[in-house]
Amino acid sequence: MYRSTLPKRARVLKRRQFLYISRAGSRCQGSQVIFHVAPSKYPGCCKLGITVSKKFGKANKRNYFKRIVREAFRLKRHSLPSCQIVVMPKNKHRPKFEELLQDFTQQIPEALNSKFSKNKSTIGGEYSPKNEQCESELP
């Protein structure tokens, strides 16, 4: 059984990481969200970053969006391939939790396979994290 928290090493935190993922990664659209997905250099490591602008709504609406995206990622991250994901809302409507779970399981593997199966090298420059390691968590 896995922990029911999302550790700090499973999050995208720095601006340069967000920029790398958006430039080097592939983009796919779910039913309510937009995913930017880039392969991870560390096997068994899946990271999540969330961006929500003020145009989406007031703070309570933005925080609700972030909470349900984090929870959907937490539930599905052990079944996802090694990747780095940035999630953005597609429109101003609150996404449904079930749709997010479905998007995480279907859209992200498709995005990784479509862009990176032909060309294994990263596109848009190299991101070299300093002292950043991601270990797969033990059950």
Swiss-Prot record:
Reaction(s) the record says it catalyses: Endonucleolytic cleavage of RNA, removing 5'-extranucleotides from tRNA precursor
Protein EC: 3.1.26.5
Superkingdom, taxonomy of origin: Bacteria
One annotated GO molecular function: ribonuclease P activity
GO CC terms, sorted: ribonuclease P complex
Top-rank EC class of the record's enzyme: hydrolase
Protein name, as recorded: Ribonuclease P protein component
Organism: Chlamydia abortus (strain DSM 27085 / S26/3) (Chlamydophila abortus)
Taxonomic lineage: Bacteria, Pseudomonadati, Chlamydiota, Chlamydiia, Chlamydiales
